[in-house]
Design a protein with these regions (language model features):
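A Rossmann-like FAD-binding core segment of flavoenzymes
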Residues: 65-159, 212
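FAD-site-proximal beta/loop scaffold in flavoenzymes
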Residues: 4-37, 132-198, 202-206
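Rossmann-like NAD(P)H-binding beta-loop-alpha module
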Residues: 24-76
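C-terminal auxiliary extensions adjacent to catalytic cores
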Residues: 234-274
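Short, solvent-exposed loop/turn segments at secondary-structure junctions
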Residues: 51, 184-185, 211
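Active-site substrate-recognition segment that forms the wall
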Residues: 49-50, 54-72, 161, 169-176, ...
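Active-site-proximal substrate-binding core of FAD-dependent oxidoreductases
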Residues: 205-249
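Extended hydrophobic secondary-structure segments that form protein cores and membrane-embedded regions
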Residues: 43-44, 77-84, 219-227
Length: 274
């Protein structure tokens, strides 16, 4: 079932903010952007964890390109604000590459700050620390939560479903939790859910044969990062396969942009038959 968005968790967000995490939100933002001609766009990460950790920064880089194409970049300020100390906390290398790309384009990153409320009338964002930040266009990464049916089932503890990291079993017999609902310390992204599904299938098969899972879940996978200007990078991460999470960045390059397109096409065909 994945994670759902709790827009109401941030007062004022539904009335005074935009978002591109949902299809409906992306369509509304498409209609809002042409009306933004100058001022400050504030991209706020409203809670953790959230899907696709690079996405807020991808949004900033792509917005930069959009404003350049319209010839109004000099009239606009782009700021990203979030509770993390770095864009991708598990890896200094990837974080620094993102920070360098933001700096090169004049995008400000404000770490260790979280927006907790918007005032749509004064266009001010209130921070958890007590301060405020003014904006002309607010784009939020909404608070995530498990679906209501998972919450009411009793599976969730402290917001997510606790599991055995090796095979993704829950504390209930014969019940697994995989993907975004699972309380494992990995990024919430489809590639990790796909890998988790394979482990769960292997574990069920092994149990039916009277054996044990031969290869535990490692939380390993690759995800792509849009750097703008037609360039794409790829992060290869392993969250659970060693003593500490690891990640490295390949690219960015135009070749990886083509690879990303091929990856998406393959998954659409596999999952949706198109």
């Amino acid at each position: 079932m994945g994670a759902e968005y709790d827009f109401a968790a941030t007062p004022g967000f539904e009335e005074g903010g935009s978002e591109y995490y949902s299809v409906a939100g992306a369509e509304r933002m498409r209609d809002v952007l042409p009306g933004f001609d100058s001022g400050t766009t504030l991209i706020g990460i409203l809670g953790q964890p959230f899907k696709c950790p690079p996405a807020p920064f991808e949004g900033a880089l792509l917005l930069h390109d959009h404003l350049v194409e319209r010839g109004i970049r000099a009239d606009a300020e782009i700021r990203v604000i979030g509770p993390m100390a770095a864009p991708v906390p598990i890896t200094k290398e990837v974080s620094q590459s993102i920070l360098d790309a933001l700096h090169e384009r004049g995008v400000e990153y404000v770490p260790k700050q979280r927006v907790v409320e918007l005032d749509p009338h004064s266009k001010e964002a209130r921070l958890e620390s007590g301060g405020t930040v003014s904006y002309d266009l607010f784009v939020g990464i909404p608070v995530h939560r498990v679906p209501a049916v998972v919450e009411s089932s009793g599976l969730a503890v402290d917001g997510w479903v606790p599991v055995d990291h090796t095979n993704l079993t829950t504390r209930f017999p014969d019940v697994y939790a995989l993907g975004d609902v699972a309380g494992v310390p990995i990024a919430k992204a489809g590639v990790f859910a796909e890998a988790a599904a394979a482990v769960v299938a292997d574990d069920i098969g092994a149990r039916l044969r009277g054996g044990v899972l031969q290869r535990p879940y490692e939380g390993a996978g690759s995800c792509y990062i849009e750097f703008g200007r037609g360039m794409v990078g790829k992060v290869e991460a392993n969250f659970l396969g060693g003593p500490a999470p690891t990640a490295r960045l390949v690219g960015p390059s135009r070749e990886l942009a083509a690879e990303k397109e091929a990856f998406a096409s393959t998954r659409r065909a596999r999952w949706f038959g198109s």
